[in-house]
Amino acid sequence: MRNNLTLFSAADDVLNHRVRMILAAKGVAFDLVLVDPANPPEDLIDLNPYQSLPTLVERELVLHSPTVVGEYLDERYPHPPLMPADPLGRARLRLAIVRIEQDWVPLIQTITTGSKAQAEVARKRLRDLVAQSVPLFKAARFFLNAELSLADCTICPVLWRLSALGIALPKDGKPIEDYANRMFRHPAFVRSLTDVERKLRDLPV
């Protein structure tokens, strides 16, 4: 029996991983269709003219922006909530998500697909951005929030990939390491991993 929700997802990608973690946090049943971006299935081509991933399908609704998908899922399935109740808290987390999307994610894409020289420049820049973010991980058990949020679902897939990208945490990065180890044990994160992503590094004991 097919579920009402279907997610077309790449097997190893931070934006796709983010949506899978949101779905896992919500405990929502869905059909996962892992897609080779270079060879998309006919279903995806018919549903999404951009053939972009991730693509979420719920009955007649088709969504294909990670941010839109994440906010839709949080509103469509309100428990547990993945954003703070207060406007200030929501705005703060949205800004953090935008920074990760605009500043961090493109660097990961350059590291994985660019030339050797481009990858090295991007690797240094991402290392610097991670180092600059250390104080943010001291603020709360989760990322700038008392509970798991969409921001955690955005940043954890990035942190999971750092070692595979050749990026070591800075000397003062223990707050990030502690946060990452907590989050990598979280059931939603564990359930969000594909077989390919599980091979990137070991889960903490």
Per-region residue spans from a language model:
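GST-like fold's C-terminal all-alpha helical module
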Residues: 96, 100-192
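Residue-level detector of family-conserved "landmark" positions at structurally sensitive sites
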Residues: 33, 66, 172, 193-194
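Conserved beta-strand edge residues that scaffold enzyme active sites
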Residues: 37-38, 176, 197
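GST-like domain detector, emphasizing the conserved glutathione-binding G-site
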Residues: 1-130, 134-135, 141
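Short, solvent-exposed turn/loop segments enriched in Gly/Ser/Thr/Pro and often Arg
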Residues: 10, 150, 196
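Acidic/histidine-enriched, glycine/proline-rich intrinsically disordered or flexible terminal extensions
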Residues: 196-205
